[in-house]
Amino acid sequence: MIALRDITVHIGDATLIERVSAAVRPGQMTAVVGPNGAGKTTLLRVASGELTPSEGAVQLDDRPLAALSEQAQARRRAVLPQASRLHFAFSVLEVVLMGRTPHVQGREGPEDWAIAEDALDAVAMAGFADRDVPTLSGGEQQRVHLARALAQIWTPPDDGHRYLLLDEPTASLDLAHQQNVLRTARAFADQGAGVLAILHDLNLAAQFADHVVVMADGGVHAQGAPASVLTPPCIREVFGWPVCVLAHPTQSCPLIVPDGAEAGATVSDPNSL
């Protein structure tokens, strides 16, 4: 488990997050939601080891994260950042092989190549191995970088677990690519990995996550199972907009619908547009 306890981050005179506690548990997918500026990415950067907290403690599988070498951390957790655009003509397979760097001494071996190919297959990109990454669509590129992250932690360590940290993995993706990316992450969690995903779409969080952390103003407003925290009062208080929460017609998760009428919103006559 990645355990974050009473995390506070100060940058200059600004406090980005304050006394935040959360966890990424093996076999579960945790979604972090909240309005812009709530501190979601800061929390992920602390969980990944990229950012050292001003106060609080971070542990990875019951050991202080800072006590692990960068290589040891990289063999246990992989990060998919918000922006992963690549402008150089690397092939898809070359990019995915970069994920094997923490495991390689010298050149990649047959096992590394096999893992890279398996990771591409996991994100439904097996037929793209020889394509240059800049020639792919944005959604295809995102899946390639997800495959790179999966390849990095493909095999569980002997003395711990794997963790996949995703910072807005569905941003700017169409419906099909959003579902493909999060279904892949969900499957990875079902295989025993811990997954942390920052999401803006509350319905995606409700659909895929086991646990939801709702952040606001640099702190945790609520956390728990999707149905227990993605409620009309919580959403209205955090996001400043009323919603209706319905039973999903085909899945066992909440369905969140913005309530424009309750907010006093007006609908334009479509004939006047």
Swiss-Prot record:
Residues 2-242 form the ABC transporter domain. Its EC number is 7.6.2.-. PROSITE patterns: ABC_TRANSPORTER_2 (PS50893), HMUV (PS51261). Transmembrane segments: none annotated. InterPro entries: AAA+_ATPase, ABC_transporter-like_ATP-bd, P-loop_NTPase. ATP binds at residues 34-41. It is a peripheral membrane protein. One of its GO terms (molecular function) is ATP binding. GO terms for cellular component: plasma membrane. It is found in: Cell inner membrane. Keywords: ATP-binding, Cell inner membrane, Cell membrane, Membrane, Nucleotide-binding, Translocase, Transport. Belongs to the ABC transporter superfamily. Heme (hemin) importer (TC 3.A.1.14.5) family. The complex is composed of two ATP-binding proteins (HmuV), two transmembrane proteins (HmuU) and a solute-binding protein (HmuT). Part of the ABC transporter complex HmuTUV involved in hemin import. Responsible for energy coupling to the transport system. This is Hemin import ATP-binding protein HmuV. It comes from Salinibacter ruber (strain DSM 13855 / M31). The lineage of its organism: Bacteria, Pseudomonadati, Rhodothermota, Rhodothermia, Rhodothermales.
